[in-house]
Structure formats: structure tokens, C-alpha cells
Amino acid sequence: MVITNPIVYGKFIKRINRFEAYVELNSGEKTLVHVPNTGRCKEIFVPGAEVILEVRDRQGRKTPYELAFAYKGKRLISIDSQVPNKVVLESIKMGLIEEFKGYDIVEKEKTFGNSKFDIKLTKGKEICYVEVKGVTLEVEGVAKFPDAPTERGRKHLKELIKVKKEGMRAAVIFLIQMDDIKYFTPNDEQDPEFGKFLREAVGKGVEAYAYTCDVGENYVFLKDRVEVVL
């Protein structure tokens, strides 16, 4: 996924709510920016952190600036919570994910039961539902999800178990929005119930995968599969 809009650089000042923050541009101007991620991201959004903003100057926006990337030390992290779905969908269509090659129909945002899953794959009578979770939390080289309790995430896992029970394929992909990660594990400290449901789901045949990303200042591409440690 490549950002084609202009980008500008700045330093993070403070987050004022789930969707907005203040950033000082390299020009010295202090401005409001939209934060396209409702997660806490406390270890990323620290005063003085270098950030990259995408300029989306469309009518009706409160601010033209979208907080797209942030540096955590030397590690560049993609912030936008819409990116993981785009990257995974693009990668499946291009045949880059070995586990999901060979499907004839690739659809996004399809409903099953009480949930809407990110991707539905079809090959003849074979159906696979895929849920994508973006991961921005890194602790000592280990990626963790979630960074805050997620009722929605727990619900998706329960529904994936139902998909599997009905004889279809069910999978969750944790798309780690950065590189140089040792492995992925559920964040039991923040949401022990999510970890419990993930382990239960995998035990009942739901597939769990984690991939890192090659992240640049205007692009995010799928990179390497890493181990899911439960």
C-alpha cells in the first residue's frame, strides 16, 4: 500500500481525545491532526516523537492532516487502523500469502451470523472467513494485541469458532504494522479474556497467523510471517 498524497513531518505534542492530537510541524506551526487509531498507543504517542502526516485536504475535514506514521526510537510504525485490511486484502489478491492462495473470489466486509468479517474467500464450495487485526504495540521486540480491552475482538473470535463449527475455514491475521519483530503473543495483561478466547479458538481449529510489515515513510507492504505464541 502506497500513500500518494503529500506527506509532512513533525513532532508529537499531545493527544486530546481518541481521534485528535496536536503536532508541531517542522515549519514550527502547531496544528491539529486526525488520529486514525482509537487504540491507546501510549508508548508511541509521547511528546517529541517524530511523526509523519498524510495531507488529505478534502472538504468537510476538520484538519487536512492525518497521522500516518510515528517513530518509536528508530522503529517506524504505521498508525492508521485502516491500513491492515488494505495490506492483507492486496496481498491475498496478489498471491503473496501462501496460506490463502488459490481462491477464486476475494470479497471484503462480508457478514456471517452477528459479525462482519474483513475478508471472505471462496473457491467452489470452500469458504474461508478472515478477520484482520492491526498491531501497533511492541514490547522488547515482541508484538502484542490488543493494547486496550476489546469487546469487539472477543466477539469476532467467538464468531470465528462458529464459522469453523459449520464446516468452513476460519482465520485471524495479526498484521504487525512494523518490522523487526521476534514473535506475536496476545496481550494478557491488558485483556486476558481476549487471550483466553484466542487460545480456545485455535484449539477448535481457527487458524491464527501473524505477519510483519515493511514500513517506509509513504508505504506499507506485507513482509514476513512470524510465530504466534499462545
UniProtKB/Swiss-Prot annotation:
Q: Where is the signal peptide?
A: none
* Superkingdom of the source species: Bacteria
Q: Name one GO molecular function term.
A: DNA binding
InterPro entries hit by this protein: SfsA, SfsA_C, SfsA_N
Q: Which PANTHER family match?
A: SUGAR FERMENTATION STIMULATION PROTEIN A (PTHR30545:SF2)
UniProt similarity note: Belongs to the SfsA family.
Protein's UniProt name: Sugar fermentation stimulation protein homolog
Q: Which gene encodes it?
A: sfsA
